[in-house]
Amino acid sequence: MRSLYLSFSLTIIFVLVIMHAEAKAISEPNAIAEADPGIFSALKTLGKILLPVILPTVAEKIKEKVG
């Protein structure tokens, strides 16, 4: 159960970071051209780390609830 909370927390953080990047791009038209490449590499790294952790955990919890 703790791992499920952790995976959901990390997912929420990941979504908030993406929303922040999108809001910055909308508010500043040239933001994508001038964007700090660090945030995009951080997003890629987060995605590579989170997806393999979250998907199996969520699938396992769903199987426990269903079956």
Swiss-Prot record:
It is found in: Secreted. The keyword Signal applies. The modification Valine amide is found at V66. The keyword Signal applies. Keywords: Amidation, Neurotoxin, Secreted, Signal, Toxin. Residues 1-25 form the signal peptide. Its main location: secreted. Residues 26-37 form a propeptide. Expressed by the venom gland. Disulfide bonds: none annotated. GO terms for cellular component: extracellular region. GO terms for molecular function: toxin activity. Toxin that causes a rapid and irreversible paralysis when intrathoracically injected into insects (blowflies). Does not cause spontaneous nocifensive behaviors by intraplantar injection in mice. Exhibits hemolytic and cytotoxic activities on HEK293 cells. Belongs to the formicidae venom clade 3 family. This is Myrmicitoxin(1)-Pm6a.
